[in-house]
C-alpha cells in the first residue's frame, strides 16, 4: 500500500497478496526447522463442486488458529486434503453426468469418477485459496489417491490380523436408494407423518387387533408378541395367529419386551422392520421371511415390484376392502433415514465387514477424556454418542467407487486371503488368486470401504507426505459438530486400535451457519454462496463475519455483518493512509526517548497481545 491510493480495492489487494504468499512460500512447513511444531489435522472437505458458506465459516475459524500459532513463533504444519472417495463422490458424479453407477460397468464408472474429479478439484481447491486459508497446499492428499488407498488398505489388514475386523451375515442397516449397507453414524432421525392402523389378525374365530405403521411388512410377519402379565391376551399365548391378507399362521409368544401401553399392547414381529425385530427373531429362533429386494421393492405375490410406500398404500387399500382395518389415526414419529439421500432405512440380511467396537465403549470414553475440548460442552456430545452405540462399525459399502477391501475369499472352503502389503494399493476384483489352503479359486471382494475408513486416518496420511516428521498426537483437530459421531469418533477409534494413542491433544468444534435462524438447504432455497459474498464484499469481510461467533455456536448469516467488515477494511485503509501521509521524513531509527503517547500505545498493544495470547 502506498500513500497515493485514494480508495481500497479489496479484490486487487487480495489477489496481489495471494500471489505473494504463493511465490514466497509463506505458509510452507519447514521440516528442517528446530522450532516447536504445531500440527493441525485439517478437515479434507468433501469434493462437491464448490465451497459452501459453512466451509467458509469453519475454515476461517481454524485458519485464525494457524496464523496465531505462526505469529507465536511455532512451525505450523497445516496440510490440505480433499475427501473424494465413496458414496458422496458417487452421488456427485451421478448428478453431474446424469448416470447411475448400478447401471454401468464397475470399471467404466470408476474411470468416469476419476476423470470428473480431475476436472473439478482444482477449481474446488481454489475457493479455499481465495478465502485466504493459509494451508501448505504442497502437502496435499486426496482420499482416493494411491497413497491414501494404500494406507487405508494397510489399516484394514492390520486390524484384521489383530482380530478386530470380521465378516458377518445378518440384518444390517440398508439404504434402498443407494443400495448399500450403512453405519449407525450415517443415520439421521427425521420426524415424519404416518398412519397408525389397527388391523384384524385371527386366532381361531376370535379377532386379535394389532396396530402398526408398516402394513407392508405383513408378508414378513413371523410372530406376534404379548406381555406375559397382560391379562387381556393370556388366553392367546401359545396359539397361532392368522396374518390378514396373507393367511399364513404365526406363533403368539409371551415376551416381556411387548409394551402393554403402546397401541393394542400386541405387536407383530417381522423380518425385519427394525433392530428390535432382528433381536426378537434371533432370540426366539424364528424362521425369517424376506420380502424386500435390495432396491426396496417387494418380491411377494400381488405386490411384486412395488416400492415400499406404494406397497404400503396398496396393502392398506386391500385390507380396507376386506374390512380388516378397525381404526386409523394420523401420527408423527421419528424415522431412521440415510444422511446422504434422506431415504428411510430398512433392515436387510446381507454379508458385511465390521470393526468390533461395542466391547470398547469404556476405552473410547477414556480416550475422549484425555483430549482438551473447545468448547468443553462438545465433549458431552461425544460421550453421548459413544454410550449410545448399538452396532459395531459397518465398514463395507456395496458400491463401485471407493477404496477396495483388500481380500479374496475361497469359493470352496471360504478361506479369507488378505493382500500382502507389497501389493497395496490393490483392487482384488481385478486380480485372480488361488486359495493357499485348498488351491481352489479365490474370488476378489467387490465391496469398497466406508469413506470414513480412509478419512479416519487423516493424521497418518498427512504425516506420510513429509516422511512422518509429524506424528500423533497432533496439536489440533478443527471440525464442525455434526461429524463428532463420524470423523472425530472414527479417527479416535483408529488411533486407539492401531497405536493406543489419542490422535490430537485439542479438538476445536465450530457451529453451523443459519439464515434467519434456520439451517440452510438447497430444497428451502436459502443457500448463500460464499463465492458471491467474497466477490461483493471481499474475503476479509467474510472472515471478519466468521470471527463473530464463539466456538461451537451457530452463526446467523446477516448482510449487515459483511457491510460492517467492509467498513472495517476501509477504516484500516484510511488509518494507514493517514500514517503514510505523516511519515515522509521518517527514518526508521529507534528514538532515544519515547513520547508519552507512544508509550501509551505500546502499553495498550502489549496488554492486548498478552490478553489474546493467554485467552
Q: Which residues does each PLM region occupy?
A:
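N-terminal, positively charged nucleic-acid-binding surface of large information/translation enzymes
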Residues: 1-229, 248-249, 253, 270-283, ...
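Gly/Pro-rich turn-and-neighbor structural signature
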Residues: 21, 147-162, 169-171, 175-178, ...
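Glycine- and acidic
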Residues: 1-4, 43-51, 106-110, 135-142, ...
Amino acid at each position: 500500500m502506498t500513500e497515493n491510493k485514494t480508495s481500497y480495492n479489496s479484490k486487487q489487494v487480495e489477489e496481489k497478496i495471494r500471489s505473494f504468499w504463493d511465490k514466497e512460500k509463506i505458509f510452507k512447513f519447514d521440516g528442517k526447522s528446530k522450532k516447536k511444531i504445531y500440527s493441525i489435522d485439517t478437515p479434507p472437505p468433501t469434493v462437491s463442486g464448490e465451497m459452501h458458506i459453512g466451509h467458509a465459516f469453519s475454515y476461517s475459524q481454524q485458519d485464525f488458529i494457524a496464523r496465531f500459532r505462526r505469529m507465536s513463533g511455532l512451525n505450523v504444519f497445516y496440510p490440505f486434503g480433499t475427501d473424494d472417495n465413496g458414496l458422496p463422490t458417487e452421488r456427485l458424479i451421478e448428478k453431474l453426468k446424469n448416470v447411475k453407477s448400478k447401471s454401468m460397468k464397475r470399471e467404466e464408472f470408476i474411470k468416469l469418477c476419476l476423470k470428473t474429479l480431475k476436472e473439478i478439484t482444482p477449481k474446488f481447491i481454489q475457493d479455499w485459496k481465495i478465502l485466504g486459508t493459509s494451508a501448505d497446499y504442497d502437502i496435499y492428499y486426496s482420499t482416493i489417491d494411491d497413497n491414501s488407498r494404500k494406507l487405508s488398505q494397510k489399516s484394514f489388514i492390520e486390524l484384521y490380523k489383530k482380530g478386530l475386523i470380521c465378516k458377518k451375515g445378518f440384518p444390517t442397516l440398508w439404504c434402498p436408494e443407494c443400495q448399500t449397507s450403512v453405519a449407525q453414524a450415517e443415520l439421521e432421525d427425521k420426524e415424519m407423518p404416518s398412519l397408525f392402523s389397527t388391523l384384524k389378525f385371527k386366532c381361531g374365530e376370535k379377532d386379535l387387533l394389532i396396530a402398526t405403521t408398516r402394513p407392508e411388512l405383513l408378508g414378513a410377519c413371523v410372530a406376534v408378541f404379548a406381555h406375559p402379565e397382560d391379562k387381556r391376551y393370556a388366553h392367546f399365548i401359545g396359539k397361532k395367529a392368522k396374518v390378514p391378507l396373507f393367511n399364513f399362521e404365526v406363533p403368539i409368544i409371551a415376551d416381556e419386551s411387548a409394551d402393554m401401553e403402546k397401541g393394542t399392547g400386541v405387536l407383530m414381529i417381522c423380518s425385519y422392520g427394525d433392530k428390535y425385530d432382528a433381536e426378537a427373531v434371533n432370540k426366539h429362533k424364528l424362521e425369517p421371511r424376506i420380502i424386500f429386494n435390495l432396491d426396496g421393492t417387494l418380491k411377494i405375490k400381488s405386490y411384486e415390484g412395488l416400492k415400499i410406500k406404494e406397497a404400503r398404500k396398496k396393502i392398506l387399500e386391500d385390507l380396507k376392502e376386506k374390512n380388516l382395518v378397525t381404526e386409523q389415526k394420523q401420527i408423527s414419529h421419528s424415522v431412521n433415514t440415510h444422511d446422504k439421500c434422506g431415504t428411510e432405512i430398512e433392515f436387510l440380511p446381507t454379508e458385511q465387514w465390521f470393526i468390533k467396537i461395542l466391547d470398547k465403549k469404556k476405552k473410547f470414553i477414556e480416550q475422549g477424556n484425555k483430549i482438551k475440548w473447545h468448547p468443553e460442552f462438545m465433549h458431552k456430545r461425544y460421550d453421548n454418542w459413544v454410550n449410545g452405540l448399538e452396532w459395531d462399525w459397518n465398514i463395507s459399502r456395496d458400491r463401485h467407487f471407493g477404496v477396495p477391501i483388500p481380500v479374496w475369499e475361497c469359493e470352496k472352503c471360504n478361506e479369507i486371503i488378505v493382500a500382502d502389503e507389497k501389493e497395496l494399493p490393490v483392487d482384488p476384483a481385478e486380480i485372480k488368486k488361488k486359495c493357499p489352503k485348498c488351491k481352489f479359486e479365490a474370488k476378489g471382494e467387490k465391496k469398497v470401504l466406508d469413506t470414513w475408513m480412509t478419512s479416519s486416518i487423516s493424521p497418518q496420511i498427512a504425516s506420510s507426505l513429509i516422511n512422518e516428521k509429524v506424528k500423533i498426537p497432533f496439536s489440533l483437530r478443527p471440525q464442525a459438530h455434526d461429524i463428532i459421531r463420524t470423523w472425530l469418533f472414527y479417527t479416535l477409534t483408529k488411533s486407539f486400535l492401531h497405536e493406543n494413542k489419542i490422535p490430537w491433544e485439542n479438538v476445536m468444534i465450530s457451529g453451523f451457519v443459519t439464515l434467519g435462524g434456520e439451517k440452510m438447504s438447497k430444497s428451502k432455497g436459502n443457500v448463500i454462496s460464499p463465492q458471491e459474498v467474497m466477490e461483493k464484499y471481499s474475503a476479509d469481510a467474510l472472515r471478519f463475519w466468521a470471527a463473530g461467533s464463539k466456538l461451537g455456536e451457530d452463526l446467523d448469516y446477516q448482510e449487515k455483518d459483511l457491510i460492517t467488515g467492509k467498513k472495517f477494511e476501509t477504516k484500516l485503509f484510511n488509518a494507514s493512509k493517514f500514517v503514510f501521509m505523516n511519515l515522509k521524513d521518517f527514518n526508521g531509527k529507534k528514538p532515544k526517548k519515547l513520547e508519552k503517547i507512544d508509550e501509551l500505545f505500546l502499553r495498550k498493544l502489549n496488554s492486548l497481545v498478552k490478553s489474546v495470547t493467554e485467552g
